Amino acid sequence: MDSAKSELAMPAVGEVFDAYASLRGLAKGQTKVAPSHDAGLGGWLVSVFDLDAAGIAALVAGAVAGSAVLAVDGQRERGKQLLRYGICDFVVNDLDEALRILKNEVRRKQPVSVCLSADSEASAREMVERGLQPEVMAGRNVLTAGPLRDRGAARLEAGTAPGELVTWKLRNEAAAWAAGPVLARVDELAAGALGEDVEETLWRRRWLQRAPRYMGRRLGAERCVRMRDAEATRMMAALHKDAALAAQVIVVRDGTPVEL
């Protein structure tokens, strides 16, 4: 197969965050969470139909949120690429195999992502026959999964979450071996800058803590979160106080590079 044809179109990290924010919005009011704790969406199933950039964003968002994710795409190579990138956990050829994996993790309320190489419409029918009902559906081919929608699955719509998008990555990309510890320190500053009185702070902190695990090699080199103006200002002030850390990263605030 021509590598140019098979290469996946990957989402920007901001698109993944926005998909995550949309998913959390759908879950609002449906999960019982202690005021000081975000338990995530463990026990939920997110079904993604087609692994284009938006579908990949939904897959990663679901895993970060704590859901089990079943991604259906007719091109097996797409799932295999995501497996190589560290973005999905399993690639399977039939729904029975997917069900064996998903059933255990949904029961344990643990995140897992399974890419199924199959036709979207046929898979949706088979899911109904097997009693596999997702809480949320996403992806370009989601309209082929009408029976699942009729049975109560919500549709994850593409959109832009409120707030300024703040991104950061290593300044010296050649030193990728150092990216993890450096970016993790910036992640902590970002989490600390989030307002304690802001409703979405708990799940944004979950994002900052867990997204690196599920972004894989292709997406994990850049981090992001959406912030209110005062939060972004606090984060920049914290970076200014740590000159050694600031010198190692490039930070972009709402599309504009920040001088650190």
Give the location of each predicted region:
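Glycine-rich adenosine-cofactor-binding loop
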Residues: 36-60, 73
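Beta-sheet entry/capping signal
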Residues: 45, 66-70, 135-136
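Catalytic or ion-translocation cores adjacent to nucleophile or general acid/base/metal-coordination motifs
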Residues: 56-104
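Gly/Ser/Thr-rich loops at beta-strand to alpha-helix junctions
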Residues: 50-55, 76, 120, 143
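Phosphate/diphosphate-binding loops
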Residues: 93-194
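Adenosine-phosphate binding glycine-rich loop
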Residues: 154-260
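Glycine/serine-rich phosphate-binding loop and adjoining beta1-alpha1 elements at the start
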Residues: 1-42, 143-144, 154-186, 195, ...
